[in-house]
Amino acid sequence: MVLVACSQQTAGAPAGPDTDKIVLTGDQKADWAQIIALENQAKALVDPSGCSSAFDCRTAPVGSRACGGPRYYLIYCARTTDSVALFRKLNAVAAAEREFNSKYQLVSTCEFRMPPKLGLSGASCQATTPGQ
């Protein structure tokens, strides 16, 4: 048996993943500004505070360098951040940046960037070592 369900977005319903899709215009500066705006929306979802243990601290990769891998990592508290919404937004940022890098034939360094080690300061997640 196969179950199939369809849904129709109604006014006031949460935005779906397609609402984060960026259409590159051919203007490199304007296209990068779109990616940064989407990245800023992702950053607005992050809350590094409200954790009672360092085990609740997480990192999330941001962007996509031309040679692969993220540009950097965001630090957040899993208890106070909607990680599903965050990663939906960050996946859109990475996809847009991959397309941007390809369209404009950008290159980057190819070193592997490790996420930072995390710790708790008060009730706020912080890097204890810098990410590379």
Model-derived regions, located:
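Extracytoplasmic/periplasm-facing segments of secreted or lipoprotein envelope proteins
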Residues: 31-67
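N-terminal low-complexity, Pro/Thr/Ser-rich intrinsically disordered segments
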Residues: 14-41
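Bacterial signal peptide processing site
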Residues: 6-9
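Mature extracytoplasmic domains of secretory-pathway proteins
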Residues: 59-96
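Extracellular disulfide-bonded cysteine-rich modules/repeats
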Residues: 58, 114-121
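Sec-dependent bacterial lipoprotein signal peptides
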Residues: 1-4
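Short, low-complexity, Pro/Ser/Thr/Gly-rich segments in the mature regions of secreted, periplasmic
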Residues: 121-132
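Functional cores of ribonucleases/endoribonucleases
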Residues: 84-117
